UniProtKB/Swiss-Prot annotation:
Membrane topology: Single-pass membrane protein
Molecular function GO labels: protein transmembrane transporter activity
Species of the source: Thermococcus kodakarensis (strain ATCC BAA-918 / JCM 12380 / KOD1) (Pyrococcus kodakaraensis (strain KOD1))
Origin organism lineage: Archaea, Methanobacteriati, Methanobacteriota, Thermococci, Thermococcales
The name this protein goes by in its record: Protein translocase subunit SecE
Keyword Transmembrane listed: yes
Gene3D superfamilies with a match to the protein in the record: Preprotein translocase SecE subunit
Length: 61
């Protein structure tokens, strides 16, 4: 049980250190990340749709 509590304490200490180093993104950085994510989702969806259409044309069902 002591080993478990030590692991939890260690994890919490490391998490606290990471949270202290990180910063909230600015609006410009947020918009860029949102655009990139949106483009990626559209691209993956388009590829999936193309594969689905090809599969439909090949199998006929």
């Amino acid at each position: 049980m002591a080993e478990f509590t030590e692991k939890v304490k260690s994890f919490l200490a490391e998490s606290k250190r990471v949270l202290l180093v990180t910063k909230k993104p600015g609006m410009k950085e947020f918009k860029l990340a949102a655009k990139i994510t949106g483009i990626g989702m559209i691209l993956i969806g388009t590829i999936g749709m193309i594969i689905r259409i090809i599969g439909y044309l090949v199998t006929g069902s």
